Amino acid sequence: MPTINQLVRKPRQLAVIKSKVPALDACPQKRGVCTRVYTTTPKKPNSALRKVAKVRLTNGFEVISYIGGEGHNLQEHSVVLIRGGRVKDLPGVRYHIVRGSLDLQGVKDRKQSRSKYGAKRPKKA
């Protein structure tokens, strides 16, 4: 335990909190251009082909981000909006692409949780 004198000379250091989403630069979302759109497989207990895209952001960062929902219209050079949020079973994927914004369309025929997938309200029959 330090003495009062030692604390006067050198105060206690605050622990630096490291950002989980460094590429966002403390912004809620960032715009970027897809450089590669592909599928990848998840970690051990799970099995699937997860849709991901490598995105070059406006601040120069290049990140891998997840494309949620069923089906998408992304290809190389598509302009997308990314937000934070990792995918637990995909190592290195710390961002999500926002559906229904810029070049990425919303999920078709989505009835529930529509706002998360950029789907418009369905017409009454």
From Swiss-Prot:
CDD domains tied to this protein: Ribosomal_S12 (cd03368)
Cellular component GO terms held in the UniProt record: small ribosomal subunit
Region described as Disordered: 106-125
Residue positions where 3-methylthioaspartic acid is found in the record: D89
Gene Ontology biological process terms from the UniProt entry: translation
Keywords noted in UniProt: Methylation, Ribonucleoprotein, Ribosomal protein, RNA-binding, rRNA-binding, tRNA-binding
Superkingdom per UniProt: Bacteria
InterPro entries found in the cross-reference section: NA-bd_OB-fold, Ribosomal_uS12, Ribosomal_uS12_bac
GO molecular function, a single term: rRNA binding
Biased composition (Basic residues): 113-125
HAMAP family per the UniProt record, alphabetical: Ribosomal_uS12_B
Subunit structure: Part of the 30S ribosomal subunit. Contacts proteins S8 and S17. May interact with IF1 in the 30S initiation complex.
Role this protein plays: With S4 and S5 plays an important role in translational accuracy.
Name of the protein: Small ribosomal subunit protein uS12
Organism expressing this protein natively: Aromatoleum aromaticum (strain DSM 19018 / LMG 30748 / EbN1)
